A protein has these predicted regions:
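Short acidic linear motifs
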Residues: 1-223
């Protein structure tokens, strides 16, 4: 069942829906400028004089950002998440808001999702699903051979790869029956299985690795 959970494809579907919904919103605002005024809590009668070309310009800008960035951020065929595209997306969006006349692009900017924040969470969740799936195979191997394998290839079954690198997850067993399984996470750097915490004590999803740890539980004496 875990093998059937593909959150990367879920991202693909959701971002296409996001794009369609944004295009529909612009079409509706073009037909009824009062809807545009609702975005700014402004019912100025002059809104009806906004030229169609302005809406068309923002619609083109919106679709450019989706085609060039948000729809390329997750590569379904390669099963990869590409953070560099999210960085480029943010730079382009920031550059547009700093132009001399940012009003030209304001509507498209308002209707674009924060793909980096969405994808960081998808990457975390998909990695967790992958780790749980691999952990199940590790336990099945242990039931059969009385110990965990020395390396993942000993499992002799197809396993998911780290979506941030396209390479196998890092697996580090030890002599005490413990193991560590991790992916490199958003920074795409192997930090040796290091988990980084944010200032509020939560997991820092921008830095460090995404780690699954197993520690065998020892029964108390007498049980």
């Amino acid at each position: 069942q875990l093998a059937g959970i593909d959150l990367l494809d879920g991202y693909r579907i959701s971002i296409l829906g996001e794009r369609d919904l944004a295009n529909l919103a612009i079409d509706r605002m073009r037909d009824n400028p009062k809807l545009f005024g609702m975005l700014f809590e402004d019912d100025d009668a002059n809104l009806k004089f906004i030229p169609d070309g302005w809406f068309s310009h923002n619609q083109r800008r919106l679709n450019e950002m989706h085609v060039n960035f948000s729809q390329r951020f997750v590569d379904i065929k390669a099963r990869r998440i590409r953070p560099k595209i999210a960085v480029a997306f943010n730079k382009e969006l920031d550059a547009r808001t700093k132009r001399k006349l940012p009003i030209y692009d304001i509507l498209s900017a308002m209707l674009l999702p924060s793909i980096d924040k969405v994808a960081i969470k998808i990457g975390l969740a998909q990695t967790a699903v992958d780790h749980a799936r691999i952990a199940c195979h590790l336990e099945l191997h242990k039931l059969k051979h009385k110990k965990h394998p020395a390396k993942l290839t000993d499992l002799e079954t197809p396993l998911p790869h780290d979506p941030y690198t396209g390479k196998p997850y890092v697996y580090k067993p030890d002599s005490k029956g413990r193991y560590q399984l991790y992916g490199v996470g958003w920074n795409q750097k192997d930090d040796g299985g290091k988990v980084v915490l944010s200032n509020n004590g939560g997991l820092d999803l921008d830095e460090g690795d995404l780690v699954w740890r197993f520690f065998p539980v020892t029964r108390p004496k007498g049980e």
